[in-house]
Amino acid sequence: MNDFDDERPVERAGQGTAVYHRQQRARWLARLPDGGARFRADALYAELDLLRQLRPKAKAAMVTEARQDPAWPVLRTIPFLGPVRVALLLATMQTPWRFRTKRNLWAYAGLAVVTRSSADYALVAGQPVRRRRAPMTRGLNRNHNRVLKDVFKGAATAATARPGPLQDVYHNVIARGTREELARLTLTRKLAALTLRLWKKGERYDPTKLTTPAR
């Protein structure tokens, strides 16, 4: 709805969701100054209505197709990986054998920690000697698959709010002095590693094996 955003007289409070509601559309269209802008906005409303009708049908078709994958019954046993998330996993990853280790998957899903270092060597008695110091962290890698990151991040966020083994993992990490955002990252990475391991082995979820690493 860029036409609304471009009109300076339109109050900024309208940047929420009210502009999309059917009962509010006539009021918003009336605020546009010329017929061309109103036509474009009305066309976008028509497109939005059509997409809203197609969305549940597309979702149902996606899940129906995903159910035919042999990995479906395995992945559906993992907590907080519902039908849509599993369908997205299957479509995005296609096969777990693309990732030799969990760290390869973490990098692909944007869960790998990026480090930087400088001045790694110093001259001692005329000889270069490597300094002993930890590299500096620069956050998570940005070149990643956003769909996959959203799947694992969404599942981990849901797990932190529901009692169970995964929430216990989250609370245990915090109890060791880790900040909440880093604890969520730890849980997200654990979920990704768990998914990779179960998918490769064809095993169903077992909460007693949460500490088993993916290989």
Task: Tell where the protein language model's regions lie, with residue ranges.
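Short coil/turn segments at secondary-structure boundaries
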Residues: D3-V19, M62, S118-Y121, R162-Y170, ...
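Phosphate-backbone recognition surface of nucleic-acid-processing proteins
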Residues: V74-T77, P83-V84, L88-R176, E180, ...
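Non-catalytic, well-ordered alpha-helical scaffold segments
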Residues: N2, R38, D42-Y45, V84-A87, ...
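Short helix-capping/linker segments at secondary-structure and domain boundaries
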Residues: M1-D3, Q94-R98, A158-L166, A193-P207
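Basic, amphipathic alpha-helical segments enriched in Lys/Arg and hydrophobic/aromatic residues
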Residues: A175-R215
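Glycine-rich, often acidic, oxyanion-interacting loops/wings at catalytic, nucleic-acid
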Residues: M1-V74, A214
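Short, conserved alpha-helical segments within structured domains
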Residues: H21-Q24, T77, L81, H144, ...
